[in-house]
């Protein structure tokens, strides 16, 4: 059960996953004092209380009974693994080698420890992966055939974090969610990348930055996007379909569909769609030449 009253507004849809922008996303500011008072009020009134604004919270140390209390095992999006269809797939694809068996075991342990996290299909987990979602405050949904490499850290402190199908994460990536992050289908992420949907406030020089609260804005990463090594994606970013983010880019704002963006801050330097359309004649000539070669081979 989500105790945050975030609200929603209409959004766009990438693939099969609806993308919604929570109300007040650009002005989601909380302070440490407000957070403490709200959490005390929540502890006194129980899990049915509504928080007026989201405090800074952490999920580390959440006891197992809290995770099971927020279980989503009956959610229709939750995949069922021990079925005849899954057994047929394992046999048909010979997915019973040691590599697969280790990952089945990791997924089983993960599901038993995190029944409040939605997995819509098979998820392949590497070594040392940390996936956290605050029970009753955050919703984490992982799509089908997602590969999460070694030592990735995925934290849904609050709000919503959604992975599409066939997402591939390299190693040592960090994703921090306090409001709303969506990663579309078939996104390819290299190593040592960072994605977050919040910033620390730093306006008041008389108050420590850690006590000034945070500002939150949603992040959208479109399907079929390639994120290079050591890329940072900051709050309030919308990345279109089929984009390429060059290594070490710092991305903030809107990146149009099929763009190649590089630099810090990231700037669009090329459009893949325009390049593809411009090379149509060249591709046609190449196809005709190959067809002519095959025709001559067949005539011999």
Swiss-Prot record:
Extent of the signal sequence: 1-25
Keywords on record: Acyltransferase, Repeat, Signal, Transferase, Virulence
GO molecular function: acyltransferase activity
SUPFAM superfamilies: Trimeric LpxA-like enzymes
Enzyme Commission number(s) from the entry: 2.3.1.-
InterPro entries: Hexapep (IPR001451), Hexapeptide_acetyltransf (IPR051159), Trimer_LpxA-like_sf (IPR011004)
Disulfide bridge positions per record: none
Pfam families in UniProt: Hexapep (PF00132)
Entry keyword annotation includes Ion transport: no
Keyword presence, Heme: no
A cellular-component GO term for this protein: peptidoglycan-based cell wall
PANTHER family: LIPOPOLYSACCHARIDE BIOSYNTHESIS O-ACETYL TRANSFERASE WBBJ-RELATED, SIALIC ACID SYNTHASE-RELATED
Function: May be involved in the biosynthesis of 6-O-methylglucosyl-containing lipopolysaccharides (MGLP). Regulates host peroxisome homeostasis in response to intracellular redox levels to favor mycobacterial infection in macrophage. Induces the expression of host peroxisome biogenesis and proliferation factors as well as peroxisome associated enzymes. Inhibits the induction of host pexophagy mechanism by down-regulating the expression of pexophagy associated proteins and adapter molecules in infected macrophages. However, during increased oxidative stress conditions, it induces degradation of dysfunctional and damaged peroxisomes.
Protein family: Belongs to the transferase hexapeptide repeat family.
Protein name: Probable acetyltransferase Rv3034c
Organism: Mycobacterium tuberculosis (strain ATCC 25618 / H37Rv)
Lineage: Bacteria, Bacillati, Actinomycetota, Actinomycetes, Mycobacteriales
